Every structure is written in C-alpha cells, then in structure tokens.
C-alpha cells in the first residue's frame, strides 16, 4: 500500500524500541509492516512507508511540521501510556499536535491507553466523545517494609526465602544506583548485577535490558527511567529504596514486577519512621486506587514551542496571527497567545516579513537545523539541594528552598555557600532549633500532592477529623503541623514573610510563626499576590523543580509566574488550606505527636 494507516504515539524512545521488538514478529506475520521513527531513527523512507508507525510526541511534531502529507492517509491514532504525558508540557504539546492534524484530516479513530487513571476527563483533552473503559486489575499487591540498615543482606535473605531469580531495585538518584550495584554484585548474583539510568549510553542501556530479559537470574539497579514499560523479562520482586515521588510513581515501579502473575510483590526500604509512614500511606492509597494527582492545568511554555513548529510547517508562505490563535485556542486563551507572540517578535524569534505574515526568525536557525523546535523536554533535577556541614563535611540532609537560615534535622543552619551546578549548599550549624521543631531526621521528601497532607495527618492523629490539624504555642511562637511537604511548606512560610510575618518552615512538616500567637482556628493563608512575589523570586528554582518545559524562558516574566502559579495549582491549594480547622493541643501533647514519628 505504501501508506501510513496507524500512528502509535508512545512517551519515550525506549518504549518505542521495546514495543517494536515485541510487535514486529506478530505484526509482520499477519502481513502488516511495522516501522518506528524516533530521534535515534529519524529517517522515514517516503517511497516505502509502513502501515503502522511507532513514534514519540517529538517525532510526531517533526513529521507534522516537515512532512505533513505522510499523515494524510491515517485511519487511527493510538496514544500509549497517556498518563505519563498528561498534565505536562509534552501532554499539552500532544493535544495541540492532534488539533493541527485534525485541521487537514478529521476522519480519524482515536484510542488512548493508561496504566493508571485518576482523572475521568483525561481522554476528553485529546479527542472528542472520549469514553473511559476500565479493565479492572485482579493483581494483588503484597509488600514488606524493611529498614535501611544492612538492607542488601535483607534483600538476599528475601531472595533465598522466596526463591527470587530476578530483582528490580529503584533508587531516586543515579549515584545510589551505581553505589549499590557494587554491593549487590556477589553470590548468588555475582556477574548478573546491572545498572540502568538516563546517563548511560543508549547502546549500554539496551545491552542491560537484553541481558536482564534473557538471563535466568539478575539484579537491576535503576532510576525512574525504568518506571516505563520497557520489557526486561519477568521480574519476581521490585525493591523501592526510599519512597518514590508520589503514588503514581510507586504504582509504575511496582507494576514492573510479576507481570505474568496475579500478585505484585514489593519491598520498601525506609531510612526513618517518616519514610515508613510515607510508604504505608502510598501503598494503602495505591491499593484503594486513590492517586491524589494534581489537578490539570495547561502548561504555558508550550505556546512558544508550538508557534515555532507551526511557523516552520508554514515556512514557504508564512502564517497570520489568527491562524496561530486557531491552533492554540483550544488549550490557551487569546490573551496568553497574543502576549507570548509579542515577546517572540520583540526577541527576534518570530519575524514579520510582510504585513501580518509571520515566519520563524533567524534566532531559531540552529534549533531548527537540529530539530530542537519539536521538543518540550527540559532537564529536571527536582529542585532539591544537598546540605553539607562545613564542620564535618558530611551530608546533613536535603532541602527544597534556599533561605539564609533554615531548620534541618532538628538544628538551625546558616548558608555559607551555594554550589548551584552540583545542587549543594555548604552550611554551618548555629545551634539547636526549638524543642518542638525537632522533627524528622529525613532527607527531605516532599514532592507529593498537597491533598495527601490530610491522609498523612490521619495516621498521626487518628482521633481528629480529616481536616483538623494540631496547633500549639511555646514562648510566644506558634507551631502548626501541616505535613504539606517542602514545596508548599516553603511557599506558605515565604509568602507570610512577604506580609511581614516572621514565618519559617521546618522540613515541610511544621509551620512556625515566630513571635506571634495565632488566634482562632483558621489556617494562616497568605495572600495570592504574596505567593506570586515568592514565585517571582524563585523562578529558576521552581522551574527546575516543576519541569516547566524547554521553552519556559521564551515566555515574558509575567507568564513565567503565571505558569508556575498554574503548575502549583495555587487556587486549589488555597482552597484546601481554607478547609483546615486548627485544633489546639498543649505543648506536651504536640511533642508526643511529633515523637510518635521517631519511634
């Protein structure tokens, strides 16, 4: 036929390659040709097109901008693992790409696949008349939690007791995956221990995947890159070294194990009582199907990227601002598009060759040549900083937000130097924090949804109502246990400080109002304008933490602030805080609540 009939869009090149390996034989057997197009395999033979093409959002963007005629023969579009793209810049990019495709081909069938779903409207964002079909899993989740001390030996013991042949271990940092791969490389797994993370060369990653797939035994130490559905064979057990970032991430990770049975078995490794409670909460919510995903908000950084891509598609004749509105308005407002467009003209990234007719500017030539205008992928480091003591040169813990003075591990610290490239802070101890603020000796977990705070609080204070949170007073100071995590904890404290309230956050768990005794039972909610000022001061660090897209800085500053404001779901966050009722307990009782997490 030499005509493309099905476009199968998958989130990553690795997933495309894995799907190709698994599908090429059965699909070819029934007389259908299967192809793939990714950044690694960018060439497409126009004289010999496959009937089914596996690709990524970025390569789909490239085809639409550079070879749109290839897509005119399509009958169907399949969106794989849509939950990994939705509510991200790449998800909004895909939404607009599908709209651009429909402008010249509106007779298409759509299908979206998702391993987890928390938002019933997810399909409607990508195509009309979306119907949700649930295939309820009968897979039972079994898990054990173990302390970090000597956990390598504990994993070996579990392997012996349960007859585990293949084990997948997830770490939240590449350095830990490398370190522990050496510690696991001993009998009975000597020579069969591998590492998998994004920094490895593609050939090495594929070699590791093949060896795990084909070998009879093996341990694979990996990072979040293996949360995706890459086929590494039948894994008997998934080990999670410290809690993942959220419940969806936990489900993705444990879902990699026991794929050919009806039971999932996982081991969670915790370093302190707080992490144990996080694990228990995550697993409990996962079993109940409660994911606590953040509410959908459009990513504004996609506006400039899609303008560049569309202008390239129209490079011969140019396009009008109205045409740009037409492709973007289903997702963004006219004001947002017009404001961003003006900034691109002012910066020379869009040029007006004839009155009202626009083209990509010379500033973009290199990005066009290398295909960079088709990607919204930006490097993300989750915005956390290692805190190193200047006295001992040891790692004290991790914090999200940088302040000159802060509380960590129950002590007060003063920043001496920030090493931004290495995400490190050198700090000196300036004394113990108040007794009531000596909270958790953790490493700074706190990327979960603010809505999870009430669930965590119920585990600590089961006798309180769901939206009741404890408050106490000591020496003219106010202490509120909020458990909102580092991200929202620092936003509250800094925004209140912006309003001349001396406020600080203790490890994303306690709000401290210094020299102020709070009256009433209402949570102290900062004004939204104060929150926006905090966002403005922390544009770069929040961009790093939130993953705001590759073209975030092509937006004007006010839109950068708005993008963070939307990404953080500040409207929903403020609404959540307004539902909290503070319940006073005496200092001794408050300390008892805190100590319950240290047992």
Positions of PLM-derived features:
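Phosphate-interacting basic helix/loop segments used at nucleotide- and nucleic-acid interfaces
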Residues: 57, 154-155, 207, 212-213, ...
């Amino acid at each position: 036929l030499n005509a493309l009939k099905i476009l199968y869009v998958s989130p990553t090149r690795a997933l495309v390659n894995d799907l190709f390996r698994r599908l090429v034989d059965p699909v070819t057997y029934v007389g259908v040709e299967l192809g793939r197009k990714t950044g690694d395999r960018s060439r497409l033979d126009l004289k010999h097109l496959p009937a089914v093409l596996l690709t990524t959002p970025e390569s789909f963007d490239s085809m639409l901008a550079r070879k749109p005629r290839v897509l005119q023969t399509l009958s169907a579009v399949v969106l794989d693992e849509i939950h990994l793209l939705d509510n991200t810049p790449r998800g909004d990019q895909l939404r607009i790409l599908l709209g651009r495709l429909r402008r010249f081909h509106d007779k298409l069938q759509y299908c979206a696949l998702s391993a987890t779903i928390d938002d019933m409207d997810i399909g409607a964002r990508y195509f009309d008349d979306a119907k949700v079909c649930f295939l309820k899993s009968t897979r039972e989740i079994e898990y054990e939690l173990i302390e970090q001390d000597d956990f390598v030996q504990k994993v070996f013991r579990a392997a012996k007791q349960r007859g585990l042949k293949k084990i997948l271990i997830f770490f939240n940092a590449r350095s830990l995956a490398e370190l522990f791969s050496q510690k696991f490389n001993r009998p009975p797994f000597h020579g069969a221990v591998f590492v998998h993370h994004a920094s490895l060369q593609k050939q090495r990653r594929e070699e590791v995947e093949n060896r795990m797939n084909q070998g009879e035994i093996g341990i694979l130490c990996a990072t979040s890159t293996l949360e995706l559905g890459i086929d590494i064979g039948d894994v008997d057990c998934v080990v999670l070294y410290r809690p993942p970032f959220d419940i969806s991430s936990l489900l993705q990770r444990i879902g990699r194990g026991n794929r050919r049975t009806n039971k999932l078995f996982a081991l969670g490794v915790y370093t302190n009582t707080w992490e144990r409670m996080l694990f228990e909460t995550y697993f409990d919510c996962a079993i109940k199907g409660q994911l606590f995903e953040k509410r959908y908000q459009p990513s504004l950084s996609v506006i400039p990227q899609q303008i560049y891509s569309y202008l390239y598609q129209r490079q011969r004749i140019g396009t009008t601002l109205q045409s740009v509105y037409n492709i973007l308005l289903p997702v963004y407002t006219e004001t947002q598009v017009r404001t961003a467009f003006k900034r691109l003209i002012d910066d020379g990234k869009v040029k007006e060759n004839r009155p009202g007719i626009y083209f990509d500017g010379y500033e973009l030539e290199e990005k066009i040549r290398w295909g960079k205008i088709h990607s919204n992928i930006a490097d993300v480091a989750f915005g956390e900083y290692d805190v190193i003591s200047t006295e001992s040169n040891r790692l004290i813990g991790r914090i999200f937000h940088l302040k000159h003075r802060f509380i960590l591990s129950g002590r007060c610290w003063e920043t001496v130097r920030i090493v931004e490239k290495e995400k490190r802070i050198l700090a000196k101890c300036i004394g113990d924090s108040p007794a009531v603020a000596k909270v958790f000796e953790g490493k700074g977990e706190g990327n979960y949804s603010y809505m999870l705070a009430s669930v965590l609080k119920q585990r600590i204070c089961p006798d309180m109502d769901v939206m009741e949170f404890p408050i106490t007073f000591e020496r003219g100071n106010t202490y509120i246990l909020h458990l909102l995590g580092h991200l929202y904890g620092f936003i509250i404290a800094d925004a209140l400080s912006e309003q001349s309230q001396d406020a600080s956050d203790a490890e994303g768990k306690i709000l401290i109002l210094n020299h102020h005794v709070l009256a009433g039972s209402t949570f102290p909610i900062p004004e939204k304008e104060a929150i926006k000022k905090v966002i403005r001061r922390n544009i770069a660090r929040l961009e790093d933490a939130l993953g705001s897209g590759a073209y975030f800085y092509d937006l004007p500053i006010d839109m950068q602030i708005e993008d963070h404001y939307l990404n953080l779901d500040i409207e929903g966050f403020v609404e959540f805080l307004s539902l909290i009722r503070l319940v006073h307990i005496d200092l001794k009782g408050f300390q008892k609540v805190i100590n319950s997490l240290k047992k």
